[in-house]
Amino acid sequence: LREVVVAVSNVIGSQRVGVRFAPLFASTEEERVYLGLVESDPFNTYVEAIKVLEDANIAYLSLAEADWDNAPDLPDDFYRAAREHFSGRILYAGAYTIEKALRVLENGYGDMFGFGRPFIANPDLPERIRNGWLLNKVDPSSMYGGTEVGYTDYPEYCE
């Protein structure tokens, strides 16, 4: 990790570098294929990696949480440790609700949040969040289907 981050930073500058991790802290009873590494000690593994990124002075750290229906949440002590060891911007993504993002933001653990599926169903998502408007529900049956249906046809909010 260190060698790659340093090499890229030397070419484009560390403030143009971001790194994404997808830490998985627990499994579920659900059978699934994990596309990545399931660590025996994810807390210490990722905290040590975050320290490497802090030392490299990169611009941001992106933490992608598992986003299936019964996915485990990141533990609170990991949120705290990530912020404690990384002074740049921290972006969280992966099944974030507005409420969860606000909790992480208010605790000072994160700076930015990715809302993939809610954005698909709510083309005006920032205005909905700002105004406390209800969100459209995502129709999962139309996702990943190969057409524009379910991607460009959700309505904007109207009273």
Residue ranges and their predicted role:
Residues 1-159:
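Flavin-dependent oxidoreductase catalytic cores
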